[in-house]
Amino acid sequence: MALHSAIKGKLISVIGDEDTCVGFLLGGVGEINKNRHPNFMVVDKNTAVSELEDCFKRFLKRDDIDIILINQNCAELIRHVIDAHTSPVPAVLEIPSKDHPYDASKDSILRRARGMFNPEDLVR
């Protein structure tokens, strides 16, 4: 059983290394849609950047996906595609991998979100 948005029945997708994908699959995120397309992609050293980019674009177009989790090191390879995605849904969240820790300075989505808030609004 996959983790679904309670109201709409939407999915979380995962793009990342084998350990990341297996962890989320064990947590119940894995699904295959009616066209037999999974909601995850395992990326390894032999994965072409074009494959990664195509998968990300497919996930963006799927109406059953609300959140895309992507290892930050994978996101760096397709940064131009991620930066071009400005719609709030599906939300794109960059996550660390086992071998690559999270670096907030590389996360363009976090930078964009920070720009939406006035620092004085956060101080009380």
UniProtKB/Swiss-Prot annotation:
Taxonomy, superkingdom: Eukaryota
SUPFAM superfamilies per record: AtpF-like
GO function terms (MF aspect): proton-transporting ATPase activity, rotational mechanism
GO cellular component terms listed in the entry, alphabetical order: membrane; plasma membrane proton-transporting V-type ATPase complex; vacuolar proton-transporting V-type ATPase, V1 domain
Record PTM Phosphoserine, positions in chain: S87
Keyword flag Phosphoprotein: yes
GO biological process, one term: proton transmembrane transport
Pfam entry (one): ATP-synt_F
Keywords of this entry: Hydrogen ion transport, Ion transport, Phosphoprotein, Transport
Biological role stated in the UniProt entry: Subunit of the V1 complex of vacuolar(H+)-ATPase (V-ATPase), a multisubunit enzyme composed of a peripheral complex (V1) that hydrolyzes ATP and a membrane integral complex (V0) that translocates protons. V-ATPase is responsible for acidifying and maintaining the pH of intracellular compartments and in some cell types, is targeted to the plasma membrane, where it is responsible for acidifying the extracellular environment.
Record-stated family: Belongs to the V-ATPase F subunit family.
Subunit structure: V-ATPase is a heteromultimeric enzyme made up of two complexes: the ATP-hydrolytic V1 complex and the proton translocation V0 complex. The V1 complex consists of three catalytic AB heterodimers that form a heterohexamer, three peripheral stalks each consisting of EG heterodimers, one central rotor including subunits D and F, and the regulatory subunits C and H. The proton translocation complex V0 consists of the proton transport subunit a, a ring of proteolipid subunits c9c'', rotary subunit d, subunits e and f, and the accessory subunits VhaAC45 and ATP6AP2.
Entry protein name: V-type proton ATPase subunit F 1
Gene: Vha14-1
